[in-house]
Structure formats: structure tokens, C-alpha cells
From Swiss-Prot:
Function recorded in the entry: Binds to various kinds of negatively charged substances such as heparin, phospholipids, and dextran sulfate. May prevent activation of the intrinsic blood coagulation cascade by binding to phospholipids on the surface of damaged cells.
Pfam families tied to this protein: Sushi, Sushi_2
Gene: APOH
Glycan attachment sites: T33, N92, N162, N183, N193, N253
GO cellular component terms, A-Z: extracellular region
CDD domains documented for this protein: CCP (cd00033)
GO MF annotation: an example: heparin binding
Annotated protein name in UniProt: Beta-2-glycoprotein 1
Organism (species): Bos taurus
Keywords of the record: Disulfide bond, Glycoprotein, Heparin-binding, Repeat, Secreted, Signal, Sushi
Domain (Sushi) ranges: 21-81, 82-139, 140-202, 203-262
Coiled-coil residue spans: none
Length: 345
């Protein structure tokens, strides 16, 4: 008969073999939950893996039973993120993204001339849908531009709906007698409005003054307005200093104030000078005198170097200063060499 202690040991081992070992807490599976979740499980107990919201199961099995060995079977189940519909193309815009999987967010922007109609970003939801809905890039348009007072449109080509696209231009012109202040061209901006409008103002000019020793002609109207013109002239032996025609400017004054300048009488009877790049006889070219503003170059002798150089003289309102270095020779002094005939320095 075996000892009592041995009998008890054999009975315990038989109980363990029949009862089996407990299973530990299962290994974590990314993006999943286990029901029920405990520290240990008795042989025969079942657990169920399920993927968290936003994830779907791929491969493997979801339900496991704790075996007598106390070792869970290898779990090949994978929980993969849901994939939202492709959204990588936005007409007339740009999409910035890494992937289209849950829970990623993508952002949107539009090209120049278009605005975002909808949200600037969207998130891939648990259901595999974009939230909020994907936006579109709509063209920026401007309504017809307001027309300033005393102005009209000279260039304007709207769309069929009488609107204009971003970047479109409109050009204004002022009514007669009115001057424009500001840019005559406005542009449809990215904000859906037009750049600053110009202003048209009525402009009047005083009657132009008659210059001394001259005359002025202008329209025989009681009032002279913007863009009206006047012409000036001078009496004999006087020349006009300034433009012959002047215009009433947008600032209410004349574009210029010409005057009449006296011509110069020459005391020199005989000399060769340079006028407008050519050698001329002053007694022939300017026998009636030099007009205001005309300029000549006189020849002078350099005594030490025995060569010639030139100095300028200009008629200024009836006065001309002859260079001191110039020496006029009498026609009888035929033996003297004129400075104009000496080699240049």
C-alpha cells in the first residue's frame, strides 16, 4: 500500500492536469479593444477583439478561447485606419496632405483669382468620410464698377452676368471741361471690389496774359476750360521764348507762360564763327541780328602756343557778350592771319 503523502500528490497533479492553466492578459493589439479585459482567464473563457472607431480589421480572427495550456494563440489580426475618398486634386487650387487615412487632416488653398468656397481644411472621420464637405475654388468676380460723377466708361468688357473676373480692368474718361484726378484705370481685386475710383472735376483757367512785344490768341468764349489752348506770337525783331501753343492744365493754370525776347544787334562787322556745327560768316548769317537763344562760337588765338580755340557767346534778350579773346581784323589788314585760319590747339 503506497504512502498517504504520495496518494495526495498524485491526486493534486491529476486535478491540475484536468483543470489546466489560466491565461494571462492578452498582448495589446494596436488600435483595438478586448472584451472582457482581465488580468487572467480560466481555461475555456473567450475574449473578442474589436477595432477602435476609425479602424477596420484586416486578416486574422477576432474571437479566442483560453486553452488548457494557458497560452493564447498567435493573433494575426490587424486594425487598419479607414481610408477616405481620394481628394488630392482641387480644380484651380492646391491640396496639402500626407495620406487620406483616418484621422488625418488635409488643407486647401486656391490659385490667384479664385476664392475658397467652403472650409479651408477637412478631416477624415471614423466613418471614412471627409468632414466638412470638400470645398471648391470659385472665380473671384466684381460687380459693375461705380461710375464717378462727370465721368463715363471708355473701356469695359464684363461677363455675360455683367460681372468681371479678378484682374479685369475698366477705364474711365471725364466729360468735356473736366480733368481726372487719380488713375483712369481700375482693376477688379482679390477682394471682389475695384481699386480706387478716379475723380472728375470741372477746371477753369484765367485768360492768358499778352506778352510784352507780342500777342496771344485764344477761343472767344466767356470761360476757358481744361484742355482749351492759346497760341502766342511776337512782334518783328522779337522771338518767342517758350512754346507757341499752351494748354489749360488740370490744375487751373496754363502749361507755360511764353514771353517775347529781343534780338541782338552785332557790333562785329566781320568774323568767321561756328553756328550749329558749321563755319559761317557772321556778317552774312546774322546780318539782321541774332535771335534770342541763338549761340555761336568765336575763334581766339593762343599767343604762346600759336594755335586757336573757341569761346561761346549767346544772345539773351537783346544782349550778347563777345568773348574778350576775340580780335576783329579789318578787311584792309590782309597781312594778318585770322584766328579761324590757325590750326586748333
Amino acid at each position: 500500500m503506497p504512502p498517504p503523502a504520495l496518494v495526495l500528490l498524485l491526486g493534486f497533479l491529476c486535478h491540475v492536469a484536468i483543470a489546466g492553466r489560466t491565461c494571462p492578459k492578452p498582448d495589446e493589439l494596436p488600435f483595438s479593444t478586448v472584451v472582457p479585459l482581465k488580468r487572467t482567464y480560466e481555461p475555456g473563457e473567450q475574449i473578442v477583439f474589436s477595432c477602435q472607431p476609425g479602424y477596420v480589421s484586416r486578416g486574422g480572427i477576432r474571437r479566442f478561447t483560453c486553452p488548457l495550456t494557458g497560452l493564447w494563440p498567435i493573433n494575426t489580426l490587424k486594425c487598419m485606419p479607414r481610408v477616405c475618398p481620394f481628394a488630392g486634386i482641387l480644380e484651380n487650387g492646391t491640396v496639402r496632405y500626407t495620406t487620406f487615412e483616418y484621422p488625418n487632416t488635409i488643407s486647401f488653398s486656391c490659385h490667384t483669382g479664385f476664392y475658397l468656397k467652403g472650409a479651408s481644411s477637412a478631416k477624415c472621420t471614423e466613418e471614412g468620410k471627409w468632414s466638412p464637405d470638400l470645398p471648391v475654388c470659385a472665380p473671384i468676380t466684381c460687380p459693375p464698377p461705380p461710375i464717378p460723377k462727370f465721368a463715363s466708361l471708355s473701356v469695359y468688357k464684363p461677363l455675360a452676368g455683367n460681372n468681371s473676373f479678378y484682374g479685369s480692368k475698366a477705364v474711365f474718361k471725364c466729360l468735356p471741361h473736366h480733368a481726372m484726378f487719380g488713375n483712369d484705370t481700375v482693376t477688379c481685386t482679390e477682394h471682389g471690389n475695384w481699386t480706387q475710383l478716379p475723380e472728375c472735376r470741372e477746371v477753369r483757367c484765367p485768360f492768358p496774359s499778352r506778352p510784352d512785344n507780342g500777342f496771344v490768341n485764344h477761343p472767344a468764349n466767356p470761360v476757358l476750360y481744361y484742355k482749351d489752348t492759346a497760341t502766342f506770337g511776337c512782334h518783328e525783331t522779337y522771338s518767342l521764348d517758350g512754346p507757341e501753343e499752351v494748354e489749360c492744365s488740370k490744375f487751373g493754370n496754363w502749361s507755360a507762360q511764353p514771353s517775347c525776347k529781343a534780338s541782338c544787334k552785332l557790333s562785329i562787322k566781320r568774323a568767321t564763327v561756328i553756328y550749329e556745327g558749321e563755319r559761317v560768316a557772321i556778317q552774312n548769317k546774322f546780318k539782321n541780328g541774332m535771335l534770342h537763344g541763338q549761340k555761336v562760337s568765336f575763334f581766339c588765338k593762343h599767343k604762346e602756343k600759336k594755335c586757336s580755340y573757341t569761346e561761346d557767346a549767346q544772345c539773351i534778350d537783346g544782349t550778347i557778350e563777345i568773348p574778350k579773346c576775340f580780335k576783329e581784323h579789318s578787311s584792309l589788314a590782309f597781312w594778318k592771319t585770322d584766328a579761324s585760319d590757325v590750326k586748333p590747339c
